[in-house]
């Protein structure tokens, strides 16, 4: 365990209210270190020096047994000092602020230009895409019109075929009905017999007729 004490010296200068005299006085302090000063002694606290020991490994191979290392901590204290910027530092700070403002304005203009460029490029691309979509929609509309036209024509053609089909089969059905009627009429004209019998107190009367059709002529025979 070891004790360490450090003495710190602080130099305070007398300054007048006049700024010019104060600046000259500071320059003298820089040139003469023995100007009016005050020594302040501060007792440092007792600190335990760190103790690092190693009995094996790389340290042992390098320095052998009993390798020890010690580290001491040194601390110091400072008093409050008044910091005054010089004219050169003030001018430099002003130039830095102006340069910063110019760079910020330049960055803003560059950002706005880049944003405008990208926006214009996007707008043109959208116009091209929109034009493509419009033309494609026009083509699609024409295709729809053609499709509906073809669909209507096909529908009308199908209805005509349906009507023709119905008419054809209706004609055949009428032909069959005509043949049936014709056969019935021919059969009834071919042989027709009429018999009439009347009974009375005075006697009876019998009457009969027979009709036979040959072509369009008819032969009638009557018996009383």
Curated annotation (Swiss-Prot):
Residues 122-140 are annotated as: CAHS motif 1. The keyword Transmembrane helix does not apply. It comes from Hypsibius exemplaris (Freshwater tardigrade). The gene is CAHS 77580. Residues 159-177 are annotated as: CAHS motif 2. Belongs to the Cytosolic-abundant heat soluble protein (CAHS) family. It comes from the Eukaryota. The keyword Hydrolase does not apply. This is Cytosolic-abundant heat soluble protein 77580. Trehalose, a disaccharide essential for several organisms to survive drying, is detected at low levels or not at all in some tardigrade species, indicating that tardigrades possess potentially novel mechanisms for surviving desiccation involving tardigrade-specific intrinsically disordered proteins (TDPs). Residues 1-38, 200-224 are annotated as: Disordered. Induction: Expression is highly induced during desiccation. CAHS proteins are cytosolic heat soluble proteins that seem to contribute to the anhydrobiosis in tardigrades, but their specific mechanisms are yet to be identified. It is possible that protection during anhydrobiosis might occur via the stabilization of vitrifying small molecules such as sugars, but not via the direct glass transition of CAHS proteins themselves. Residues 24-38 have a biased composition (Basic and acidic residues). GO terms for biological process: response to desiccation. Residues 1-13, 200-215 have a biased composition (Low complexity). CAHS proteins contain 2 repeats of 19-mer peptides designated as CAHS-motifs that comprise each two octapeptides connected by a tripeptide. Its main location: cytoplasm. GO terms for cellular component: cytoplasm. Disruption phenotype: Affects slightly survival under dry conditions but does not affect survival under frozen conditions. Keywords: Coiled coil, Cytoplasm, Repeat, Stress response.
